[in-house]
Amino acid sequence: MAQAQYAGTGRRKNAVARVRLVPGTGKITINKKDVEEYIPHADLRLVINQPFAVTSTQGSYDVFVNVVGGGYAGQSGAIRHGISRALLEVDPDFRDSLKRAGLLTRDARMVERKKPGLKKARKASQFSKR
């Protein structure tokens, strides 16, 4: 018989993460690399594990992630979002705790575009009155 798999898609900034949860030992694999190898920052690894901490399911599922776009922070946020959505498939009762922790909400903040005539999105050259 096939093993149960739960899928979820997460997005953050320019990153898109496709997440699969399989009952297992808690091993996280991102783009066929171990999480410690793929994401060098410990605080971002904590971000990825947040949904498991909130639902107290640490070590219950192996996580397989395919993530594209963005940098470390965006990808970590996308993975967290994807794991949260996949955990909803596992048990719909998790919705309350995940929603309260704000893990089901897609973070809509994006980089503001650079405007013509300015140096950056908002940085202008110094204004001279005279």
Swiss-Prot record:
Which GO BP terms, alphabetically?
translation
One Pfam family from the UniProt entry? Ribosomal_S9
Q: Which GO terms describe its cellular component?
A: cytosolic small ribosomal subunit
Keyword set for this entry? Ribonucleoprotein, Ribosomal protein
What are the protein's GO molecular function terms? RNA binding; structural constituent of ribosome
Per the similarity annotation, which family is this? Answer: Belongs to the universal ribosomal protein uS9 family.
Name of the featured protein: Small ribosomal subunit protein uS9
Q: Which organism is it from?
A: Streptococcus agalactiae serotype V (strain ATCC BAA-611 / 2603 V/R)
- Source gene? rpsI
